[in-house]
């Protein structure tokens, strides 16, 4: 294990390893740790889920997207690959780049990747498939499951600009989802976190037996993790939905 610095170890002292934290307490603890760590950049706060699924089975693959109420704290560049009347719809919705085969060729021939989200209409997907090797490893390949292959271009662009986050469980059953920057107000981080947890909970595979969300932690890019009280958080979400 890599040797931890003095600031990290001091931040670690702020976490009670035997305690399960509420979301509000976790955010507050991360803020206190940030004062100790004194990083020179605005760290991303993320939720990490340990799910009781085996992703090698297709029916246990957890994948989706969520529109964070308060975004991610950065302006995303959106590329729409489409044709015909949908070009104007994409431009009016605020897409940064819009095109068809010209955009596909630009990516293939110039290794152009100056965008954060790629949206495509279904009619373009046979041609977009050529980009799989380039976009796939970067998590940028359009996919109907997360709303980036769609006829409703306006909605997709609007959601991407607002801060729609895509997520996918990894092969070990872990799921990482960013919820904002440490500079965000506490309430904004809490509300973003609740939206993510509620969305992930709704994606529980129908045939899954046993516990779905085994544990959750919250951390910043380089901070220690804070364990969350999964049962209490899920109960409060159920009560709110009732």
UniProtKB/Swiss-Prot annotation:
This is Large ribosomal subunit protein uL1. Pfam families: Ribosomal_L1. Coiled coil: none annotated. PROSITE patterns: RIBOSOMAL_L1. The gene is rplA. GO terms for biological process: regulation of translation; translation. It comes from the Bacteria. Binds directly to 23S rRNA. The L1 stalk is quite mobile in the ribosome, and is involved in E site tRNA release. Protein L1 is also a translational repressor protein, it controls the translation of the L11 operon by binding to its mRNA. Belongs to the universal ribosomal protein uL1 family. GO terms for cellular component: large ribosomal subunit. Part of the 50S ribosomal subunit. One of its GO terms (molecular function) is structural constituent of ribosome. InterPro entries: Ribosom_uL1_bac-type, Ribosomal_uL1, Ribosomal_uL1-like, Ribosomal_uL1/biogenesis, Ribosomal_uL1_3-a/b-sand, Ribosomal_uL1_CS. Keywords: Repressor, Ribonucleoprotein, Ribosomal protein, RNA-binding, rRNA-binding, Translation regulation, tRNA-binding.
């Amino acid at each position: 294990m890599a040797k931890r610095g003095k600031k990290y170890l001091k931040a670690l002292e702020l976490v009670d390893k035997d305690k399960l934290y509420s979301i509000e307490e976790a955010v507050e603890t991360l803020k206190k740790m940030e004062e100790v760590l004194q990083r020179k950049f605005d760290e991303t706060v993320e939720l990490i889920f340990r799910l009781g699924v085996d992703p090698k089975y297709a029916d246990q693959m957890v994948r989706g997207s969520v529109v964070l109420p308060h975004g991610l704290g950065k302006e995303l560049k959106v590329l729409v690959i489409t044709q015909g009347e949908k070009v104007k719809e994409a431009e009016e919705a605020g897409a940064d780049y819009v095109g068809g085969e010209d955009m596909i060729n630009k990516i293939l021939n110039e290794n152009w990747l100056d965008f954060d989200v790629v949206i495509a209409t279904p009619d373009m997907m046979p041609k977009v498939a050529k980009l799989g090797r380039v976009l796939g490893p970067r998590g940028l390949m359009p996919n109907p499951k997360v709303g980036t292959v769609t006829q409703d271009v306006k909605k997709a662009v609007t959601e991407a600009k607002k801060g729609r986050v895509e997520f996918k469980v990894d092969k070990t059953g872990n799921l990482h989802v960013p919820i904002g920057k440490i500079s965000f107000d506490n309430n904004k981080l809490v509300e973003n976190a609740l939206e993510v947890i509620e969305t992930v909970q709704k994606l529980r595979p129908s045939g899954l037996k046993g516990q779905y969300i085994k544990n959750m932690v919250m951390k910043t890019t380089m901070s220690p993790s804070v364990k969350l009280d999964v049962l209490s958080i899920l109960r409060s979400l159920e009560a709110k939905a009732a």
